[in-house]
């Protein structure tokens, strides 16, 4: 039984972002149900969108909604699903990349306010350290 779940373009992104000083183990894969989670980065900084962006177009052309589970990343292809886990409390959420950014130095991913608050402590303001994993659905290749 062969299962394929990695997109070649994501493979290139993962390896181009991993340096000899990076603590990320890019070969770390977890399987839960029909999904695999491939570690992309630990200790990444996440922030969230301000409400003023609601209703504006994202780089993918979609209209931004701060109540949906979406995110911005500088490199992931639009439509990529990632699991974002708050390293302080272990809470996680799955978001779909539909925009580019963040453009603040040191930030890796911008989450919608809904996604950010789902995994934040207390009222969920500011930024947090997160683990980012690529999400792929396992597709059975047997006919």
Regions inferred by a protein language model and the residue ranges of each:
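Secreted/periplasmic proteins
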Residues: 1-143
